[in-house]
Amino acid sequence: MPSARPGSLKDPEIADLFNKHDPEKIFEDLREIGHGSFGAVYYARCNLTREIVAIKKMSYTGKQSQEKWQDILKEIRFLRQLNHPNTIEYKGCYLRESTAWLVMEYCVGSASDIIEVHKKPLHEDEIAAICLGVLSGLSYLHSLGRIHRDIKAGNILLTDNGVVKLADFGSAAIKCPANSFVGTPYWMAPEVILAMDEGQYDGKVDVWSLGITCIELAERKPPYFNMNAMSALYHIAQNESPTLPKNDWSDAFCSFVELCLKKMPAERPSSAKLLTHAYVTRPRSDTVLLELIARTKSAVRELDNLNYRKMKKILMVDTCETESAVGDTDDQQDDHAGGDSSKSNSITSEHSIHSVGVSAASSQSSSSNSIPAAAQNHHHIAAHHHQQAASAAVAAAMHHHHHPHQQPPPSWPSGQQGQPVPPGAVSRNSSRHRNRPPLPNIMHSMNNNVTPTNSASVVPAPAPAPVLPPPISVLPHLSAMGHVGGGGTGTGGSGGGSPASGGPLADRIQPVQPRYLTTPAAQAAVYAASSASSQQAISNAVNDHGPNNFATIRTTSIVTKQQKEHMQEEMHEQMSGYKRMRREHQAHLVKLEEKCKVDMEAHKTALDKEYDTLLHNFTRDLDRLETKHQQDVERRAKQTSAAEKKLHKEITLKQENDRKVYDLNRKKEYKANKERWKRELSMDESTPKRQRDLTLQSQKDNLKQHEAQEEQRMLQAQKQYIELEMRKFKRKRMIMQHEHEDQQLRDELGKKEQQLQQAHAMLLKHHEKTQELEYRQQKSVHQLREEQINKQHDTELHNQKDYMDRIKKELVRKHAVELRQQPKSLKQKELQIRKQFRETCKTQTKQYKRYKAQVLQTTPKEQQKEVIKQLKEEKHRKLTLLGEQYEQSIADMFQSQSYKLDESQVIECQRTHEQLEYELEMLTAYQNKNKKQAQEQRDRERRELENRVSVRRGLLENKMDAELQQFNQERAERLRMKHEKHTKELEAFDNESIALGFSTLSLIEVSREAYADEEGSLSGSMISLAHSNSSTSFPAGSL
């Protein structure tokens, strides 16, 4: 489902994040106090509560609008969840014209603002108090599973009550662990730089950044700050952890920093554990931060007063070479004091202020004295022009204070050499101005981002229109609130790398403008001071507009410098592009891994479905087989019952027929015996008839009795026979049933064995398919990683070469400026030498006149003409010799200065070339090491996958062998149990038969009955009984 359009509030969850009111009606008196890649931060007052707040305006239009919108939503969600004394307080958020207004708690400044104002490191107790507040805030964040990922002095804010606040959560991670490339380069932990290559990281990256911040507060800049930011990344990833010099700091502080900067995250303590460190818990004053803030405010006020006096001096005093030179000297000293500060101390993430000056300014400061001191005379003369350029821009400021939305006034007509000439600003000594070379606007000498090695020797081209010099007044506030919590506090507030630390404050500050002269309206009022009532005009401007005295320890020059540096987007775009590329790489990799995961899940689901279908088919087949067996058993039981009944019926019918035949034969025999007995008796006539009748009757009775006995015996025999045959039939049928059950069991077990073999074959097939998919997915992931690392290395090399080209071009420009300025400097020195020559000539002329007068007083008058001629010739000879000496001095000076300049430039070029080559070599070595580690990781992952596949195959085979063995055991057990059951049933039947009077042998004899086949029809069976007649029914001689 595609993401919603940036700024759309159709989603109720997103709409709930923003207030529905118009922020321009709620907040007033907006004053810009910070600037960065996200936009700007403003001081403001709420009309409803009269509360002072800071507003971070973030635009989500232009390139990557969807990404900007998601970043805004993430920061809002993050801030809404925080509730801790050491995190910035969230006030609300509004939407207006494609811009999000993020309203937060207002703070007076950041730790970087303090070192920027004082131009010197903080004390250990002050750093410890700041660390305690930071650790408390970090411990709270880490307990919620959050990571800040951009801890630095510029993001550590202070309130008027001395409470430390963590700000700028634009780079924060909502989940822990994380693995994205986010943060400010100089403060990044090694595991963040290597996040994509070596896995994830946790909240201990904030502990590393805190350690770097401690070094920043102790040395005014973080390690590797004189390097290109890209180069710093490679050094952080490869080199050992930075340390503090133990001679300058206590053991507890050095130990604390050393623990924070443990290279291995596992050895680095957590933020909660560091809260118990001796450095943080040792006794100190409870008001150490309050005193620091008060001292900083006092220093800022001193800066205001000093610069106000300078501005008044510029406006009120007529041009004077001596005064101008003094003023220019002060300005140059101030420029030197803040020279390195042109380089901001952070290249922030998308939500941090990005601002990086040219690092060559700080890395090449060793050549700052390569231009001869004589060249500075030119700049003493040029100070007046700087002051005029500054005064020409002041009028617009006061006017803008009344009308902040109006356009600035048009430029005044240009004077000589293209310099702007404000009305009433033409000096009485304008004839001298026409002979002076063009000089730069004071803006360039004070706050140019490209700080030259020798600020006294580089004079940029004149500006076509007056530009306001950036004042260092107590203007709003911290680094980009930034200072209030968002984005980019670091740039404005960090002190840069100014080498001037120590000495009186007045010698270490930049010339600034009072806070009440920061607007065009105020400047316009000050311009009126060039008239006779200038002093009254300045007082009126101050009274009318007030001192803008809202609480802050941030100077106006920081804000102005942020705005100027943000205009130089090249380095910002380069670093932002690099971060964006790393994030895109991470997103592509995550997307591919998610796709692989989804494909694997779908693959496993398909395989599981196929296997489940097979098992379901197996179950269905077994159920069908069991049903068939059950039906077969029931059918056979019915057949057995029917066969038993039929056999009983047939035997009964046969026996009835036998009895009928027996009765018929018995009657025949009885009749035959009766006739025979009658014949035999009738032949014996001697026996009386009565006796013969009695004898016949007796024989008849005996025969009937015998026949009755025979009949009874036959019935008993038939009964025993039918019972025996039925027992035999039942026994045989039981044996047949047992055999049939055995066959059914064998069929079932055979079916199960066949199914088990099919299941195992399918499992092996699935294993092969899964293995093939895993290898294919791993190959695609490895290929993507390799392509990404190659692209990343190409980008890094391209960025490094761009940086080298930029440094070389800037060095060439600097040398060209030095060469252009050299004739001016040499001309000034030549003029000084010629002036000395003229003064010497005047002195010698005076001495000659006095000497001539003395000689003529003692010389006779007739010889005076000759003496005068000789003295004149001597004078001409000495003056000629003196002129030649001065000309030779000028030539020697030209040659010496040219040689020194050439030599210093060659040395500077050589050092710069060596430094750039060293950085390129470090980058190449880092990339080679990175490639080697990446290849080793891929090989290791490949081996691990092969091992996993092999182990899985082994486990699968072991499982199949175990299942087969279990099946064999189950089959043997079931066969055994079935055999035992049948044996017991047969034994019980035989015992019952014995109890009924049947012997086992008689039961196992072959039956004389023809049983129907088990599968055949009982109707087709024939029962054949042995032939029986009456003669066989009686034993021989029974008659």
From Swiss-Prot:
Main location group: cytoplasm
Domain Protein kinase: 27-280
Residues binding ATP, per UniProt: 33-41, 56
GO MF annotations, alphabetized: ATP binding; protein kinase activity; protein serine kinase activity; protein serine/threonine kinase activity
Origin: domain of life: Eukaryota
UniProt keyword annotation of Manganese present: no
Low complexity composition-biased segments: 359-376, 388-397, 413-429
Coiled coil feature spans: 631-765, 835-993
Region (Disordered), start-end ranges: 324-457, 485-508, 629-648, 677-707
Protein name: Serine/threonine-protein kinase Tao
